[in-house]
UniProtKB/Swiss-Prot annotation:
The keyword Phosphoprotein applies. Transmembrane segments: none annotated. The keyword Transcription regulation applies. PANTHER family: PERIOD CIRCADIAN PROTEIN (PTHR11269), PERIOD CIRCADIAN PROTEIN HOMOLOG 2 (PTHR11269:SF9). PROSITE patterns: PAS (PS50112). Residues 959-972 have a biased composition (Low complexity). This is Period circadian protein homolog 2.
Length: 1255
């Protein structure tokens, strides 16, 4: 570097000064002497042909130097050069003295020496044919000088513009103090020295004595010199980037003797090469150092003013294969590279193993460093990386070139990070372990061979092939690849506990890939949609959060314009990019995190929440935090039996979690509840929390044209295979669950699309009816804007559920409908849109096995009646249903009798219903005849389907009061419900069809509700224990728009569906076995899951919809009864079951299930439980002993006293309706000690026997 001082650049024109000739003759003669001396000297040293060898490289370099320094007229032939050089050397000037000649000779020798030293610094890639030419050397020297000067100027500009850091915080030392405070850190390591570099001038103010032994030079060599002069030229930029004043930590942070650790160095350290003088081989040898910078102030001895300095602790890095060697098992490092095969990051551990500093490899081609024979392997490796989809895998060893030119053999493991939005590989992660080291253990030795100036054509071609390969989106069968270095366990697979089907994911994957191949647009526009998908996600989320009503208002106009197209949304949806598991999971994690910010920190392990208890919405949490009412601090009472069962995931017929739930996070347990049961699917469906929140799913979902239900009935007969818990099994299970998760989300999406179209259809019909606009609670028939409604592009019609345009039963085509006058004598607040319908055929009572009496009057066709202005309506009386919020349909007998005609038979399971009042008193409708029910049917069904529940008959109140019936019989109150029936997925027909939204207050002051009752907040003073045994005093009525006579072609089905929904919400257990309706589970079983309690609303999670009624706490219900002090805070809406009555009859028939024998189902379940229990893991004796040593409480069995609490902190009212089961009752035997087994005997029989007894 000292040679750089001989060629300082001029401030005015630095590029011309070294090459411009001087006007005087003496400097010109010096230049000629330099060129001649350079030529002759180099020829004598390096060329075997002697001075007369004109074709040597040394003569060529001499000629280049002569052409640089001589003026144009002095450029002559090589022979002339030789004559001039001989004349200048052997014929000195007669006018001068010998002293002048000797000074010229000394100057000439010094120039030759400097030029040779400059040639040593020339990198190998700048050399021509392995030789350093004079021109290339001078150019490189000039560029290096400019770089150093530019760095200094930038440094000064940075210091002047930003100002100095606060002087009060920066410690100040003198040179002597600096030596004392640094000695305690460097005295322990002989390869470590300390140096203080001024941040103002760049000069060395202090350097420790260890440099003399490290560099074998005197300490004075560093005095009054700039530190960058000792660095390798290509490391100067790295040094300046890491020593910016505002990036440096204060020395006081690590000034303590014990606080300075290796971890502290690794966080802030960087690598540079340092050299002082050339070695005995007559070339400069740089040594790599790890440098850790700190910010201090140093006061110079002469000046009183202290200046900011960078204190560097530099430690020399030795080869990992030389003593002290790195152990073979620790010779591991990682790299990342981009899809175009450029190094993106290199682990620091690679420095002693490869000899390269991180800056040497970053942004350089990977293939250049590999052995030529191993380069083709990289194409196969990247193909497997694309197929694995983020899963790490091992591959055959490769040979990697170290800095000294030798190859080391590496065992490699590869993985990748996949962008969840574009589904493309962002970067590839390689984990390498050295198998065979180099023969030359000094990996920092100089490379003896010349480096390639340009990439070999084969490298370039191979790189292009790999880059084109990785432009493809990753197949969806792969996992996320989120984990660092390919660790897929770092993210949470929330689906694993509810899955029981082994083929759902694979079927969905095959179908998805086949559809991608069929869709030409998607195949052609991969790169297009990959760039747009992220923007669509962000845009959709922003739009839905900021202005959802504005989006919804534009939907009717949009759909009106597309009436001529059969399925416009379906066509548009096919072109949208696919929605991946990562997208849904990422957005769900963000949403749950944001919700947890408002959640009160009350998650203590007093009682566990089962996975099927829906998580609180953010509005619930805000209310639970600020509301003084009973909602605050109340959550659903837990079902410990449910969470303690050890049923595995292979049990296809049980809606139970596959493992005991974690208590770390309430939201993580409740985000995916097994409540959505589809017909034909034998596994609990994971409910997606973001069905209503996250806009990414509906927008980017791959809309399949096939039916929504892909799983056949044959899956339940899948044999039980005894599999070990291996890495392959876990990976396959993870992929299967992700695919199943996406499939269920897709089905939910399709269902919501169908519902939104039904909603729009009913809105279009009800336009022009002012009474409907003011009738609250009627979402499906009113013109009220729905805040949850997505835009038109997010919905698609399902062809098999669309009514024909010429249908006389429905106006589903969306055309304009003329307004009809209201019905004569119709009470506007006592009719539900599902209770009145247009019917083209008379109705009859339901056939068996209906458990209660339905008085279904009949009436003639609309054309035969002339008295009323609108067609009359069929109606029926709903019996008393055991729900926590009793609701009874108001009925009106028809005005005219008519002959009976057959209707569609809707088969029902043997659900148990308490018998209800057949009809209302005739006093309400004195002018109309009453049609009695069938007593035979009533008595038969009451005796056949209610063996355990005594019959109760409620006295109706005026008008249509809700009868008070108990949801739990006395026989079931004294014991815990069976653990197999704790699931809230009680109805297989519950297809995520209930959508809740707020209904603004209308002019009538009466808030309308539906037959679907929410399991949440009933009144301000309702306690968890009261709603099981008492009914709310406020009768619930509904307003009916006058146009609903055209809304229901299947009034029998819609009314029954409404009734089923009431029963489904009342029963906490229902049909836990999700195989069929005929499983025969008790409809009104006592359940500690708290379905009848008045907790904060969980139905939004339960049904996968927005519980926006929680958002409007001002919505009250004025009843006019004696109990008018009760206010209804939750305004419920009609489920989509009623809307589905407008669908075609063939569609409705697809939801019928054959009944199954209860005993046969239970017998299968017991056998599966027994098989699964054999597969449960058992502790070995050594494991038991180890656990006893760590956890003393395991010696006695049970749980530690800190968490062994039998109470539930969420149960404030300790009445008989609240059943909180202690932990000891459901703890399975851990097999830890004899005491544990004894305790199990005391508490009862083992789990499987108790299950059999209780079922």
């Amino acid at each position: 570097m000292n040679g750089y001082a001989e060629f300082p650049p001029s401030p005015s024109n630095p590029t011309k000064e070294p090459v411009e000739p001087q006007p005087s003759q003496v400097p010109l003669q010096e230049d000629v002497d330099m060129s001649s001396g350079s030529s002759g000297h180099e020829t004598n040293e390096n060329c075997s042909t002697g001075r007369d060898s004109q074709g040597s490289d040394c003569d060529d370099s001499g000629k280049e130097l002569g052409m640089l320094v001589e003026p144009p007229d002095a450029r002559q032939s090589p022979d002339t050069f030789s004559l001039m050089m001989a004349k200048s050397e052997h014929n000195p000037s007669t006018s001068g003295c010998s002293s002048d000649q000797s000074s010229k000779v000394d100057t000439h020798k010094e120039l030759i020496k400097t030029l040779k030293e400059l040639k040593v610094h020339l990198p190998a890639d700048k050399k021509a044919k392995g030789k350093a030419s004079t021109l290339a050397t001078l150019k490189y020297a000039l560029r290096s000088v400019k770089q150093v000067k530019a760095n200094e100027e930038y440094y000064q500009l940075l210091m002047s513009s930003e100002g100095h850091p606060c002087g009060a915080d920066v410690p100040s030392y003198t040179v002597e103090e600096m030596e004392s405070v640094t000695s305690e850190h460097i005295v322990k390591n002989a390869d470590m020295f300390a140096v203080a570099v001024s941040l103002v001038s760049g000069k060395i103010l202090y350097i420790s004595d260890q440099v003399a032994s490290i560099f074998h030079c005197k300490r004075d060599a560093f005095s009054d010199a700039k530190f960058v002069e000792f660095l390798a030229p290509h490391d100067v930029g790295v040094f300046h980037s890491f020593t910016s004043p505002y990036k440096l930590p204060l020395w006081s942070m690590c000034s303590g003797a014990d606080s300075f650790t290796q971890e502290c160095m690794e966080e802030k350290s960087f690598f540079c090469r340092v050299s002082v003088r050339k070695s005995h081989e007559n070339e400069i040898r740089y040594h790599p150092f790890r440098m850790t910078p700190y910010l201090v102030k140093v006061r110079d001895q002469q000046g009183a003013e202290s200046q900011l300095c960078c204190l560097l602790l530099a430690e020399r890095v030795h080869s990992g294969y030389e003593a002290p060697r790195i152990p073979p098992e620790k010779r591991i490092f990682t790299t990342t590279h981009t899809p175009n095969c450029l190094f993106q990051d290199v682990d620091e551990r690679a420095v002693p193993l490869l000899g390269y500093l991180p800056q040497d490899l970053i942004e350089t081609p990977v293939l250049v460093q590999l052995h030529p024979s191993d380069r083709p392997l990289m194409l196969a490796i990247h193909k497997k990386i694309l197929q694995s989809g983020g899963q790490p895998f091992d591959y055959s060893p490769i040979r990697f070139r170290a800095r000294n030119g030798e190859y080391i053999t590496l065992d490699t493991s590869w993985s990748s990070f996949i962008n969840p939005w574009s589904r493309k590989i962002s970067f590839i992660i390689g984990r390498h372990k050295v198998r065979v080291g180099p023969l030359n253990e000094d990996v920092f030795a100089a490379h003896p061979c010349t480096e390639e100036k340009a990439l070999h054509p084969s490298i370039q071609e191979l790189t292009e092939q790999i880059h084109r390969l990785l432009l493809q989106p990753v197949p969806h069968s792969g996992s996320s690849g989120y984990g660092s270095l390919g660790s897929n366990g770092s993210h949470e697979h929330l689906m694993s506990q509810t899955s029981s089907s082994d083929s759902n994911g694979h079927e969905d994957s095959r179908r998805r890939r086949a559809e991608i191949c069929k869709n030409g647009n998607k195949t052609k526009n991969r790169s297009h949609y990959s760039h747009e998908s992220g923007e669509q996600k962000k845009k959709s989320v922003t739009e839905m959060q900021t202005n959802p009503p504005a989006e919804k208002k534009a939907v009717p106009a949009m759909e009106k314009d597309s009436l001529g197209v059969s399925f416009p949304e379906e066509l548009a949806c096919k072109n949208q990019p696919t929605c991946s598991y990562q997208q849904i999971s990422c957005l769900d994690s963000v949403i749950r995190y944001l919700e947890s910010c408002n959640e009160a920190a009350t998650l203590k392990r007093k009682c566990e929440f089962p996975a099927n208890v829906p998580a609180l919405r953010s509005s619930d949490k805000r209310k639970a935090t600020v509301s003084p009412g009973p909602h605050a601090g109340e959550a659903e009472p837990p079902s410990r039996v449910n969470s303690r069962t050890g049923v595995g995931t292979h049990l296809t017929s049980l809606a139970l979690p596959g493992k005991a739930e974690s208590v770390a996070s309430l939201t993580s347990q409740c985000s995916y509840s097994s409540t959505i049961v589809h017909v034909g699917d034998k596994k609990p469906q994971p409910e997606l929390e973001m069905v209503e929140d996250a806009a990414s799913g509906p927008e980017s979902l791959d809309c399949l044209a096939g039916p929504a239900l892909a799983c056949g009935l044959s899956q339940e007969k899948e044999p039980f295979k005894k599999l070990g818990l291996t890495k392959e099994v876990l990976a396959a299970h993870t992929q299967k669950e992700e695919q199943s998760f996406l499939q269920k989300f897709k089905e939910i999406r399709k269902l919501s699309i169908f519902q939104s179209h039904c909603h729009y259809y009913l809105q279009e019909r009800s336009k022009g009816q002012p009474s409907e606009r003011t009738a609250p609670g009627l979402r499906n028939t009113s013109g009220i804007d729905s805040p949850w409604k997505k835009t038109g592009k997010n919905r698609k019609l399902k062809s098999k559920r669309v009514k024909p345009r010429d249908s006389s039963e429905s106006t589903g085509s969306g055309g304009p409908v003329s307004a009809r006058p209201p019905l004569v004598g119709l009470n506007a607040t006592a009719w539900s849109p599902s209770d009145t319908s247009q019917s083209s055929c008379p109705a009859v009572p339901f056939p068996a096995p209906v458990p209660a009496a339905y008085s279904l009057p009949v009436f003639p066709a609309p054309g035969t009646v002339a008295a009323p202005p609108a067609p009359p309506h069929a109606s029926f009386t709903v019996p008393a249903v055991p729900v926590d919020l009793q609701h009874q349909f108001a009925v009106q007998p028809p005005p005219f009798p008519a002959p009976l005609a057959p209707v569609m038979a809707f088969m029902l399971p043997s659900y148990s219903f308490p018998s209800g009042t057949p009809n209302l008193p005739q006093a309400f409708f004195p002018s109309q005849p009453q049609f009695p029910s069938h007593p035979t049917l009533t008595s038969e069904m009451a005796s056949a389907s209610q063996p355990e529940f005594p019959s109760r008959t409620s006295i109706p109140r005026q008008p249509c009061a809700c009868p008070a019936t108990r949801a739990t019989p006395p026989s079931a109150m004294g014991r815990a419900s069976p653990p197999l029936f704790q699931s809230r997925s009680s109805s297989p027909l519950q297809l995520n069809l209930l959508q809740l939204e707020e209904a603004p207050e209308g002019g009538t002051g009466a808030m309308g509700t539906t037959g679907a009752t929410e399991t949440a907040a009933v009144g301000a003073d309702c306690k968890p224990g009261t709603s099981r045994d008492q009914q709310p005093k406020a009768p619930l009525t509904r307003d009916e728009p006058s146009d609903t006579q055209n809304s229901d072609a299947l009034s029998t089905s819609s009314g029954l569906l409404n009734l089923l929904l009431n029963e489904d919400l009342c029963s906490a257990s229902g049909s836990a076995a999700s195989e069929s309706l005929g499983s025969g589970s008790l409809g009104c079983d006592a359940s500690p899951s708290g379905a009848g309690s008045s907790d904060t609303s969980h139905t939004s999670k339960y049904f996968g919809s927005i519980d926006s009624s929680e958002n409007n706490h001002k919505a009250k219900m004025n009843t006019g009864m004696e109990e008018s002090e009760h206010f209804i805070k939750c305004v419920l809406q009609d489920p989509i079951w009623l809307l589905m009555a407008d669908a075609d009859s063939s569609v409705m028939m697809t939801y019928q299930l054959p009944s199954r024998n209860l005993e046969a189902v239970l017998k299968e379940d017991r056998e599966k439980l027994k098989l699964l229990q054999k597969l449960q893991p058992r502790f070995t004796e050594s494991q038991k002993q180890e656990l006893r040593e760590v956890h003393q409480w395991m010696q006695t069995g049970g749980l530690p006293a800190a968490i062994d609490v039998a109470e539930c902190v969420y149960c404030e009212n300790k009445e008989k309706g609240n059943i909180c089961i202690p932990y000891e009752e459901d703890i399975p035997s851990l097999g830890l000690s004899e005491v544990s087994d004894t305790k199990e005997d005391e508490n009862g029989s083992p789990l499987n026997h108790r299950i059999e007894e209780q079922t």
